[in-house]
């Protein structure tokens, strides 16, 4: 999308507004009452470094005032976005550093989508910043930055698995299971002490199978105890700890879990004018509807068998 084109700008502003409707309504009330209280930051060519959401809300209040029921006098203070302009010689690396410090290193970083911190780490690494540098910008520990980068790698594997590469909106409300899964997979790969009770010598291929099975359950929006029963580490273990349970569970999963009726490319060709995010959400929902009975039934059966294993080991 090109923010300089009116059509693309409208799409971007709609996305920003819809992503945090309640929060945006509260901010709009504040802007109406008090005006803009904090300056934004803008590059010399007009790119907003800090303040995209506020700029969008100011535009919305001023240019949609009649639709929203406000008079010119009520929204006059919203006519302009007040900002500090960066010098002409500011480089991309400098801009990204400044943007991160302002957006992710302050208390209001909670305003941002959880996935954004992962993408910001990736971008800063691309620009050559170390994990220690990024940690300083974000007021985090280097170990946290390393974990976020690893979790994003896992998220991107997930997107590739379903032909959603680069479409990060499909990760909405999945952060928790991905964080858990990354920790589980890391423990299995490194054979840490928290997997010593596993009763078989699993291979890298088995770990890969585990990852793909968990991807299907994440896609179906499983989390909490049900999700943890598949791969959890620690003294209580999980289905993956027991060779007989895992192989039977995996077989049932592979045989009975349906595949998508259409590829992403087929959907794009069939509905060329439809919003891609809507198409993909519909695709996921249709798959969930067809798969949820099998996923739920298989997991419940083997969770009961897992409880029996745990009881017999006590």
What do the PLM-derived regions correspond to, one by one?
Residues 178-201:
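A short, Lys/Arg-enriched interface patch at domain edges and termini
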Residues 217-246:
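Eukaryote-biased activation of long, low-complexity terminal tails and linkers
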Residues 1-23, 137-143, 147-186:
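N-terminal leader or domain-start segments enriched in small/polar residues
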Residues 53-70, 202-208, 212-223:
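Short active-site loop/helix that positions an aromatic residue
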